[in-house]
Amino acid sequence: MSNLTARVIPCLDIKDGRVVKGVNFVNLVDAGDPVESAAIYEENLADELCFLDITASSDRREILLHLVERIAEKIFIPFTVGGGIRTVDDVKAVLEKGADKVSINTAAFQNPKLLTYSSEIYGSQCIVCAIDVKHEKERDRYEVFLHGGRTATGREALDWAQEAAEKGAGEILLTSMDRDGTRNGFDIHLLKNFSSSLGIPIIASGGAGNPEHMVEAILRGKADAVLAASIFHFGEYSIRETKKAMEEMGISVRLD
């Protein structure tokens, strides 16, 4: 991690216009209205917001631009949008609707030049490469998965992340599919591997169960930001108390 302030980022996983949350990418349950959730998170000291239309890529349909626009009208914190972004025109459309960054997953893997073209036009600070990984126990490595975790690629995750950074990604959103929704803590080994090998910020995703897990991701995993969904959506913990736990452990955070 760099010496910058650590960021806490709530994630709105969107399906059919509603916030949903599942375990290991399946068994989805409704977690509320995205526009209301966005406004509440901003009031509660979220540093950024992440909006992922989780079935846009697998359903081959357009991202919910009207919803992006409604959320962008409500909030002033940086706002990342992903899901179903396949072309530079998609990047343009999302940014024009008010997003500050775009998160590209499947399409970036299938066409890495999309990262290059997008970063050349809009700047790498706008381009987040999202990578969903699963641990392969037999070979003790992490494999990249596409289409919301449905498609195995056979490619080693760090190898792809390094290429993505070279192609123009300004940040990596790294999700452990094994930990997703389990609330058992982040995969620290995975985070350490990525943060020590890449020169761009890493957002840790998958496994947050309490503020201590987020502290661990920053201090031990050396992540630059932590992303969480279920622990915030269902009200067990607030972003404010998460940040206070971080501050108590010497992590620089924004508290006003």
Curated annotation (Swiss-Prot):
The active site is at D13, D132. GO terms for molecular function: imidazoleglycerol-phosphate synthase activity; lyase activity. It is found in: Cytoplasm. The keyword Acyltransferase does not apply. Gene3D superfamilies: Aldolase class I. The keyword Oxidoreductase does not apply. Keywords: Amino-acid biosynthesis, Cytoplasm, Histidine biosynthesis, Lyase. Pathway: Amino-acid biosynthesis; L-histidine biosynthesis; L-histidine from 5-phospho-alpha-D-ribose 1-diphosphate: step 5/9. CDD domains: HisF. It catalyses: 5-[(5-phospho-1-deoxy-D-ribulos-1-ylimino)methylamino]-1-(5-phospho-beta-D-ribosyl)imidazole-4-carboxamide + L-glutamine = D-erythro-1-(imidazol-4-yl)glycerol 3-phosphate + 5-amino-1-(5-phospho-beta-D-ribosyl)imidazole-4-carboxamide + L-glutamate + H(+). It comes from the Bacteria. One of its GO terms (biological process) is L-histidine biosynthetic process. GO terms for cellular component: cytoplasm. Its main location: cytoplasm. Its EC number is 4.3.2.10. Signal peptide: none annotated. Pfam families: His_biosynth. Heterodimer of HisH and HisF. HAMAP family: HisF. IGPS catalyzes the conversion of PRFAR and glutamine to IGP, AICAR and glutamate. The HisF subunit catalyzes the cyclization activity that produces IGP and AICAR from PRFAR using the ammonia provided by the HisH subunit. Belongs to the HisA/HisF family. This is Imidazole glycerol phosphate synthase subunit HisF. The lineage of its organism: Bacteria, Pseudomonadati, Spirochaetota, Spirochaetia, Leptospirales.
